[in-house]
Amino acid sequence: MSLFNKVLASVGVGAATVDTKLHKSSYTINEMVTGVVEIVGGNTEQQIDAIYLTLYSNFIREIDDKKVNDQAALQSIKINEPFTIQANEKREIPFSMDLPSIVPVTTGHSRVWIHTGLDIKNAIDPSDKDFLDIQPTRLASAVLSAVQNLGFRLRKVDTEQAPSYLRNRTKIVQEFEFQTTNNTYRRYLDELEIVFLEQSERSVEILIQVDRRARGLGGFLSEAFNMDESFIRLTIFENDNIQAKLADAIESKMR
């Protein structure tokens, strides 16, 4: 019977199972995710070579001018040394994982989850998937509020493959796209996009993309040759007048 159980376990029947239990489901960027991984033995003992936790996010990739959905592994950790789980034994292994500053906020179509995988020799590896609610840092929230107070309306939020000039820093970026509702800005701008490159409690580094509205022949030619988009890299600190600093940066591209 023992040999038969081992054969069944090798194809996933009566094998060990895994369930990751998070201490909470909602986290802020840069916070530490904590919890336990619960492994329950199946009908026979099995050797658990490794337990991996991998942080994933979905994102949009552009291939041949078509947008396709994909997923990116943002971080992975191993939480154990090899051990044997006995039949019907229950074992809990605690873990902690830092959320990197590049993890997207879970708004719009953006999703973030932890995938738990067991590496079991000569067997189908069981797995588990737990979704997270990710909130921006306090300072990032203040930046987004300041942009809206300047007269911009948040139109959409997308997580996309990082452009080539940022791929040495991150695989993906989350773009907050704003449409102007302010009459002063509307004369000069079509839209505004903001990407958070780094976030901490005391500062945020952002990339602002300003899409200028075409004005006259010169503006038409700029737009025709994709020269109408300007980039601003800006670091904002917790003691800054955020709204004034953003306004100065945006208006510098309107002149």
Cite the ranges covered by each PLM segment.
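Terminal, compositionally biased non-globular sequences in eukaryotic proteins
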Residues: 1-255
